[in-house]
Amino acid sequence: MREITTGKILKDQKVTGTGFLVAENIVVTAKHNVLTAEDIVDDGTIHEREIWFLITEDDPVRGKTMNLREAEKRGIDCVFIRLEEKLSEKPITVLTEAENDFTGDFCKISGYPKEASGKIELQGCIANGTEDKFIISVNKEDELQDYQGLSGSPVTIFGCVIGIVIRQENSERLEALPVKYIRNVLKCHDVPFLSLIHI
């Protein structure tokens, strides 16, 4: 099983969500964690943003978005951030473009919702999905009233990241972007993927 390094995403010194390491110096998160309507210049221009990634409370690492303009143009709630330093000495490949249907499979989500005091792990079941999203039914004992801060968290099956959380439907259900969709929509040249495996 692969170890997945998750951390908090900070924008303008405020925690906006969760992100996780997908390469030695690249983090992925939900685009809305780093871009709000106020960030878009009057003429519609979008500039790459400085973002901080925080694994331990007192040691944030600075980075800059790699594909914010492209993500906004293509309408996908996902962005990659290149960090100024490597956080791993060994190659990392956690994003998994799987070929099978996950409906009915159990999954895990780990991240930093504001309602919790630190990192938590939720378990659930993939309820249904389409090419561009899937729905997770959170186990009753793991349900929260508000999942704010969980956006950008990895969704894993057997340690493989198959998606990232982008929003909450209600206290019982979360919506996620499939890795396969992210790879099809965004240029991800510097990001390693495991392609078309059966989990």
Residue ranges and their predicted role:
Residues 27-28, 162:
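Conserved PDZ fold ligand-binding element
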Residues 20, 143-166:
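Catalytic nucleophile loop of clan PA
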Residues 171-182:
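A short, polar/charged loop-to-alpha-helix boundary motif
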Residues 84-89, 139-146:
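Short solvent-exposed strand/turn elements
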Residues 197-199:
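Conserved small/polar residues in nucleotide/adenosyl-binding loops
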Residues 2-16, 20-24, 31-39, 43-134, ...:
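Serine endopeptidase catalytic core focused on the charge-relay Asp
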